[in-house]
Amino acid sequence: MEQLFSAGISLLLSKTYPAAYSCFNRISDEDFSVLYNKALCCFMVKWYDECYRLLCESEQLMSGRNITREAELPEAFLRYDHAEGHPFHPMPQGIPVCLAYRQLLLLKAETAFRLHLYSEVKSISACLGGKYKHIEKLINNITDNDNL
């Protein structure tokens, strides 16, 4: 399993999404990081329905764990994360659950936007305290489209 996961991460980083997905798909013991990485592969090839389904499944696996709204990071890192943070990178194994959940929500917001699930995007933004610049841009795009 570790070799498949490592291979999947390497392939994901090299943008070889079909091969990365194949590696993650062969892992029988799916934890939230495996499901997230499969979802990211789906997002990158514009298979948004499957991406959203996998993210919801991954989120279910996280439920009941100690998920905090904000990772305990120094202020400088939080400012950077809020301004520059994006979900388009693999999720490593062993990542603290609070960071994994934040990363999952960021990708889920992007996916929900592409599926026109605008209330979901707004709900995720509220859950994250409206602090993430790229999610707020998505919401502004929703608002701009509503005004057309």
Predicted region positions:
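Alpha-helical segment of the N-proximal tetratricopeptide repeat
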Residues: 1-26, 107, 123
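Flexible helix-coil transition and linker loops at the boundaries of alpha-helical arrays
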Residues: 24, 63-98
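Boundary/linker segments of alpha-helical solenoid repeat arrays
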Residues: 32-37, 61-74, 130-143
